[in-house]
């Protein structure tokens, strides 16, 4: 299984990178607020809560609700961030513009 970690991509820098990092920490602490254009991301176990995991190269990996699509637990979406500022403006800035694996 591929290693998944939470962190900032090497290309993120400056205020956008700092803002994104703070949003990631707040998201992990408080959970994700679902909206019409947001996938409510579930963690990998009951202790993790609602989280999206940063996997580098501008992508977040989020389990699909309902799961079971890939034969190894939940199906996944990789959701690309168009730019860090979009996410920093609001927790609902994570839009599903990725693809299913």
UniProtKB/Swiss-Prot annotation:
It comes from the Eukaryota. This is Uncharacterized protein ECU07_0020. It comes from Encephalitozoon cuniculi (strain GB-M1). The lineage of its organism: Eukaryota, Fungi, Fungi incertae sedis, Microsporidia, Unikaryonidae.
